[in-house]
Amino acid sequence: MSEGDADGGGREIWIEKYRPQTLDDIVGHESITERLKQYIAQNDLPHLLFAGPAGVGKTTAATAIAKEVYGDDWRENFLELNASDQRGIDVVRDRIKSFARASFGGYDHRIIFLDEADALTSDAQSALRRTMEQFSDNTRFILSCNYSSQIIDPIQSRCAVFRFSPLGDAAVDEQIRIIADTEGIELTDDGVDALVYAADGDMRKAINGLQAAAVMGGTVDEEAVYTITSTARPEEIREMVTEAMDGDFTAARSQLETLLTDVGIAGGDIIDQLHRSVWEFDLEEREAVQLMERIGEADYRITAGASEQLQLEALLAALARGNET
């Protein structure tokens, strides 16, 4: 990497620098983008609901729609709000209504993009539904959420619903290599594999991880990636679980302590990695089901506010105890 790039591309954020500008540029969701392009071509854009995990292209798709519909005027006709930052009924009543009432450039409608709409309260969603009805002649709403089940049915019934799945490994791999080549970064194959694993289908996380590792200077390899992303290596997760299932709780607990304290991995992230690793173990189906149940119980309790370390230790203890008989 050149000296001028040593601070990560002149401090430019790569997720913005390499954000797809058109629907055709979006990778991994071709069936969705084709339907969206048909709506635009027919000048028949409905209200839209994009559901799916973070970093899979929901915001990018909404922005690309605005750019294709309005061209250079897209900023004046596109309002983006983040419901998790601006919760409550006032968002719906004030900002959305004032934008929906205005017009710019003689277009048939404007677009309001409400990100993380599942963070809105039930009252706010009900108000949003009424606003959607009131301004349906000149405004199109695009809502994004992680979980469509958190969106009230009256809103879902007014939208065309698109479900964005996590991106495939090949799509993330390809994009990471393109960015590394463009930025002049020396990126090893095991570094790519580590970024793909750490991202788990989240392109934003993969690109952020690449930039963070590149800022450190030198070659971006798996060691740099796992360190900068605070991700456990797959073999470390396997070793910890194998030790527990072999009845060596002390060794498994020591490995857990290393991951939590020395490496600095959050308990919730360890749970996610455990869940991803279940089928990599040589387990009978009954054993795999039991392990999945224990992971689910620990995840539920951690989400409810219980101690991450205590719940993970209890999970390992249950595995060790279950294999003593």
From Swiss-Prot:
Is the keyword ATP-binding assigned to this protein? yes
Q: Where does ATP bind?
A: 52-59
Q: Please state which protein family the record places this protein in.
A: Belongs to the activator 1 small subunits family. RfcS subfamily.
Q: Quaternary state and partners of this protein?
A: Heteromultimer composed of small subunits (RfcS) and large subunits (RfcL).
Q: What does this protein do?
A: Part of the RFC clamp loader complex which loads the PCNA sliding clamp onto DNA.
> What keywords is this UniProt entry annotated with?
ATP-binding, DNA replication, Nucleotide-binding
Q: Which GO terms describe its cellular component?
A: DNA replication factor C complex
Which SMART domains would you find in this protein's record?
AAA
The reply on keyword Zinc-finger is no
Task: List the GO molecular function terms.
Answer: ATP binding; ATP hydrolysis activity; DNA binding; DNA clamp loader activity
Q: From the UniProt record, report the name of the gene that encodes this protein.
A: rfcS
Matching HAMAP family: RfcS
List, alphabetically, the PANTHER family matched.
Answer: REPLICATION FACTOR C / DNA POLYMERASE III GAMMA-TAU SUBUNIT, REPLICATION FACTOR C SUBUNIT 4
- Pfam families found in the cross-reference section: AAA (PF00004), Rep_fac_C (PF08542)
One of the GO biological process terms: DNA-templated DNA replication
Q: Could you name the domain of life of the organism this protein comes from? A: Archaea
Q: What is the scientific name of the source organism?
A: Natronomonas pharaonis (strain ATCC 35678 / DSM 2160 / CIP 103997 / JCM 8858 / NBRC 14720 / NCIMB 2260 / Gabara) (Halobacterium pharaonis)
Per the UniProt record, the lineage of the source organism begins with: Archaea, Methanobacteriati, Methanobacteriota, Stenosarchaea group, Halobacteria
Q: Name it.
A: Replication factor C small subunit
